[in-house]
Amino acid sequence: YGPLIVLEPGQKYDLEHDKTFVFSIGRYAPFGSMLIVNGTPEPDPVELKTGTIYRLRLINITTNESDLRVRLEGEGAPVQWKVIASDGADLPAALLKSSAADMGLTVGSTRDIEYESDREGHVEMKISAPGFEALIMQPFDIVFAK
């Protein structure tokens, strides 16, 4: 699993601050079809640092499925994030604003999210789809930036 990310001439991919998540449907016995993240039903935690801005690239490649619901939460409630790009195009400055981290993501679409935490702890990206009893969680461990 991996995306094709197109950058502007001279722009470099920032491996430390860009985190990509590809959502799809996998077949894992004995469960049948289930949501997976980056090719696995049990993704490893991603370590983030406090005070650091990250670009979370969300890509929905599920086929013939309903829209996904993506929610990033800490302590049971959505955290704040900022949608900065949609389907490969940066959003105009007038549309850039922080909001509760909860949105729909249609089949074949992408969203780039800006996320920064000011405190240590654990947050989870919860991905769900209508018709699937279970949801999948991508854990994040936020550590103090040294």
Go through the PLM ranges and name each one.
Residues 1-146:
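Copper-binding active sites and cupredoxin-like electron-transfer domains
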